């Protein structure tokens, strides 16, 4: 779809990865309240928060990311037009490059180790002969947000969840698992709506379900392994020095949390991976600081999520490598615009949230 739109608008293909990153890896992933992205779900068990943590700050961050990204893409497009550059100027691949991406073992390895997905899944499942109307296509997305909100604000709080404190249920609480429950149920309901509205358009629904189930194995096992890795790191004697250094960073706990998450996201090349390790190792410490200082856990949740979506988009990131391969572009052609849109814009939004959160608290 992106290639068709860019070709029709005579927009350079090299800007396509940045445009995709703006829509998938910035405000929709880390800032918009209620987003079902895994990055927004990871902090919930640590801070006892919901997907709608710090909604006001999240909306402000989303506006900053989107406005800055759209501004830069507009500048880049205008500059390309003045130079006489159009869609066909990037011509080393002229067709749909997804088969090449799915067959490239290097691309598959980088994407897989980044806890994203196996690009070979692009070619699995079945495709409908024609797409649904725009209203039917958007409805499942609306169901996710609405169901998530209803579950979080009304259904789960009204339930008797005293049984969760029993050892057989892990001696947990609703605040620790409620966010995960609401996201899971919202996604399940959206899938049911999608299937019900598009059943006749699905030539082989079982093949699509099988492909989706297979694709889910990699992120599930990867996140589980990261939790174990984070626990091992936290148990090392040298970790105390790292923890003291992180907590000693000037600017308060919000800055410390942001720096720790940024560094680990950069090292792992993954937003979810970096945040999982950071919170598994330092989450209890930051939660204790929150209780002692009165700092809102919702604010820490939003700062952690936005921080994870900044330096994760370095050149070795599996999603970046896969996106460039699928779009038929190279790092030399497209990476600068992608960094400005996905990294610099997120950094500006992160600083904005930290400043506003420090001044006014969570809202």
Residue ranges of each PLM-predicted region?
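Juxtamembrane boundary at the C-terminal end of a transmembrane helix
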Residues: 353-363
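Alpha-helical transmembrane segments of multi-pass membrane proteins
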Residues: 11-28, 54-59, 63, 253-266, ...
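Interfacial loop-to-transmembrane junctions
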Residues: 10, 212-213, 323-344
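Core transmembrane alpha-helical segments of multi-pass membrane transporters/permeases
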Residues: 174-238, 263, 267
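Re-entrant/interfacial helical elements at transmembrane boundaries that shape
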Residues: 1-5, 34-46, 273-288, 318-327
């Amino acid at each position: 779809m992106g290639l068709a739109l860019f070709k029709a608008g005579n927009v350079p293909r090299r800007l396509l990865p940045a445009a995709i990153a703006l829509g998938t890896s910035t405000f929709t992933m880390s800032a918009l309240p209620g987003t079902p992205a895994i990055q927004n779900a990871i902090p919930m068990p640590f801070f006892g928060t919901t997907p709608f943590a710090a909604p006001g700050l999240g909306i402000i961050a989303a506006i900053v990311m989107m406005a800055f990204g759209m501004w830069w893409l507009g500048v880049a497009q205008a500059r390309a037009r003045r130079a006489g550059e159009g869609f066909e100027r990037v011509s080393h691949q002229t067709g749909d490059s997804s088969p090449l991406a799915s067959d490239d073992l290097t691309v598959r390895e980088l994407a897989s180790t980044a806890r994203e997905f196996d690009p070979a899944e692009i070619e699995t499942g079945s495709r409908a002969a024609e797409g649904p109307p725009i209203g039917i296509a958007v409805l499942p997305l609306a169901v996710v947000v609405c169901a998530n909100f209803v579950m979080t604000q009304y259904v789960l709080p009204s339930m008797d969840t005293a049984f969760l404190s029993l050892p057989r249920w892990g001696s947990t609480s609703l605040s620790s698992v409620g966010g995960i429950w609401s996201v899971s149920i919202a996604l399940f309901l959206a899938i049911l709506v999608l299937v019900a509205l598009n059943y006749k358009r699905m030539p082989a629904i079982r093949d699509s379900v099988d492909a989706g189930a297979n694709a889910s194995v990699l992120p599930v096992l990867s996140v589980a392994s990261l939790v174990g890795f984070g626990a091992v790191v936290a148990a090392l004697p040298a970790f105390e020095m790292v923890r003291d250094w992180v907590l000693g960073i000037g600017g308060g706990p919000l800055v410390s949390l942001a720096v720790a998450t940024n560094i680990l996201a950069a090292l792992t090349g993954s937003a979810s991976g970096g945040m999982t390790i950071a919170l598994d190792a330092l989450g209890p410490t930051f939660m204790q600081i929150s209780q002692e200082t009165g700092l809102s856990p919702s604010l820490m949740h939003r700062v952690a999520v936005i921080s994870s979506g900044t330096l994760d988009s370095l050149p070795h990131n599996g999603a970046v490598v896969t996106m460039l391969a699928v779009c038929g572009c190279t790092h030399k052609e497209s990476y600068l615009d992608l960094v400005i849109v996905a990294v610099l814009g997120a950094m500006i939004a992160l600083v904005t949230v930290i400043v506003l959160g420090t001044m006014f608290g969570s809202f």
